[in-house]
UniProtKB/Swiss-Prot annotation:
Pfam families, A to Z: AICARFT_IMPCHas (PF01808), MGS (PF02142)
Span of the signal peptide: none
GO cellular component: cytosol
Family statement drawn from the similarity comment of this UniProt entry: Belongs to the PurH family.
GO biological process: 'de novo' IMP biosynthetic process
Keywords tagged on the record: Hydrolase, Multifunctional enzyme, Purine biosynthesis, Transferase
Name of the protein in its database record: Bifunctional purine biosynthesis protein PurH
EC id: 2.1.2.3, 3.5.4.10
Catalytic activity: (6R)-10-formyltetrahydrofolate + 5-amino-1-(5-phospho-beta-D-ribosyl)imidazole-4-carboxamide = 5-formamido-1-(5-phospho-D-ribosyl)imidazole-4-carboxamide + (6S)-5,6,7,8-tetrahydrofolate; IMP + H2O = 5-formamido-1-(5-phospho-D-ribosyl)imidazole-4-carboxamide
Species, as recorded: Prochlorococcus marinus (strain MIT 9313)
Amino acid sequence: MAPIALLSVSNKHGIVPLAESLHRMHGFQLLSSGGTAKVLEDAGLPVTRVAEHTGAAEILGGRVKTLHPRVHGGILAMRGDPDHEVDLEQHQIPPIDVVVVNLYPFRETVANPQVSWETAIENIDIGGPAMVRAAAKNHAHVAVLTRPDQYDRFLVALSDGVDDQLRRELALEAFEHTAAYDVAISHWMGERLTEQASQWLEAIPLRQRLRYGENPHQHAAWYSAPQQGWGGAIQLQGKELSTNNLLDLEAALATVREFGYGTEGAQQAVQDAAVVVKHTNPCGVAIGTGVASALSRALDADRVSAFGGIVALNGLVDATTARELTSLFLECVVAPGFEPEAREILATKANLRLLELAPGAIDAAGRDHIRTILGGVLVQDQDDQSIDPTSWTVASKRSPNAEENADLTFAWRLVRHVRSNAIVVARAGQSLGVGAGQMNRVGSARLALEAAGDQARGAVLASDGFFPFDDTVRLAANHGICAVIQPGGSKRDADSIAVCDDFGLAMVLTGKRHFLH
């Protein structure tokens, strides 16, 4: 009797070459159903339909196709077991030797935020996981393939005989496949049925192993959902991404998205913006008339720190922008797109990592912010709620003028992306000084004001948290700051407001804190 391979896949990439090799080179009978069977038949391969094999027609609009003893008995039977052999003979069930199954695209379906409940439910696979689990359980006798990237390795092994080690590895990957699938379903349903945290975090597949972690002695790996967030990024050139690259890219992208992100239509950037990041903190941020102008201003904000930095741009990179990018050493650049001439210019920097990240991939990513602690993880919403200046209050006697209001809004967009304690000095849509990560707020203010230097006069200052004392505001006033924005809420707010009034500064309270740890 010819060996049997059962093929039923949602992702049909590589299925025809696999089936051709199984049938023509290794003598397998091909058993299939639905769309997979049609693809194989259209390729000229002889296929036995599952309905023909079982003698039972597909029912319930295709919901029941493979859930049948003649399928599962063939998968689960242990070769050489006398009782199993008797059952197979009595019920005329031929053994199935290879199971090639991947599941309905549930994760991809629910990546669309507008997906209906009914559509999502119809993309929950039932028969597929049952076959995968059955084959994985009986891996001593059945090889189970759940991903196209396994096909070539399996065919090479098949020529010499599939050993126990490969069968076990394939079984492990199969159980990982179904486990991740079930977690994705429960996570999605939980998010929509309750405001509370889901009982389980979503399973995220391995994308690639990284050279090392934050330091060379640390092992590291990158897990990412396909086509979601950074999983949808295309690396156009440059060296392999590192752990630190990815952390900095995430920080840069989050900051530049404050000003919109995209190249056209509804995804056109609101303001052309550029962000330069070092060690997850923005060291230069600016808006401009065109991406090239924004980049030049962002680099000018702190060219010393920009060396070896990560750049995020929120619009199409043209030749002028590309020339600016090649003017100094940078690690990575991310943008929604690159013009052909820009690609040619940037190609002269062979080690520069270029990433193209479409707005759609960002939209498809979840909003959970996840951090690890010893023995567990912490999950919170992203701090990405839209900023609404109409909800702010003026606490000082003097109100900010229109120019100051624009600067305060810009600085407030930026400060929530700086590590706490965070202080930002800015003017005319450009950061002038950033104070990050100090253990006291006035220390961060000193750093930001020193970096701004003489440019602090007439600029604004933003703080991610309230002022516990009036020392920060007094320091700002002595450096010529004209307006301050902060959450408010300190028992000593009145002291800081009084200093503003004494020096003629405007103070705006947002009522919202933006700590970043």
